[in-house]
Amino acid sequence: REKLGDAFLSPYTIIRARLAFGGFDFIVEPYSVFFENTLPPVLAAFDGAVAALKAVTSTDETHAEPMILYLQQYRSALAEDRVDKLEEAWSLCDRRWMDTKAGIQIVHDIEDGYSDPLRAKQGPDFSLRFLDETFDTQNSQIQDIHSLICKYYKSRKTSLSADGLTALSNTIAGIYYIPFKTGCSLVFSYSGQSIPNRLDVKKDKGVKIYFDAVETMARVEQVKSKVLDIFADARSSVIDKFQPDAVDQLVWHVAAHEVGHAIYGIRSISQFIQ
């Protein structure tokens, strides 16, 4: 446990308040301390998953080895009880995660800002994502868009575009099916998500972009309902005429938007913002 102070802004800690001297005493605790009664079966599940992956056949070794290293580091980061070691542990977890390229993806505690209005704390999170073969054609179109954007920024030959080209060229993107999620993913679900957020990891390893067709379809229905509430004759003049399609929006609007984050994220151009 750490006194409130330098550890306050550590993203992978939780602040506990307890009564003391007629007031409150605030303590900063890593996940492993705050969730000490919850984590043991979780850590055991990680050990089981690693053991199972080590037993896979040789034909799967290309994807198994990076996943083993990732899960081992993920477990290590969850179990870390020293506040001053948390950033190093989770940064390495991001890097190990970026090395996993299989169609089955696990996503850890990686988004900041969505679960904490102060944008200080990392929301505990976990989700399982499958590259959705239902959308093979659309995923191929997303890859074509990505290739065109890479070609454009390579042609610019500016220092700003050059700084982001490693991340952009290493980007993988696609429409994923997400059968299981927990933690802050239950509070807010993404139509499109571009991660990791650490700029050094992004520059070295690239970016992963996940598109969720189910969530995008839900957003389209919400917009339709709002349009009908606001505009007269909206169904015949707008909705029936244009027939908004969620998957088309993912491919031709959200994909380009999220891929663009890989090269021109706000964190990349902060020195140019006055």
Regions found by a protein language model. Name each.
Residues 14-17, 26-28, 33, 128, ...:
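Hydrophobic transmembrane signal anchors and adjacent membrane-proximal interface regions, especially
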Residues 265-273:
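Post-HEXXH active-site segment of zinc metalloproteases
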Residues 19-20, 100, 257:
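Generic detector of intrinsically disordered, low-complexity, polar/charged segments
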Residues 59-238, 246:
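Contiguous, non-catalytic segments that form substrate-binding/exosite surfaces or channel walls
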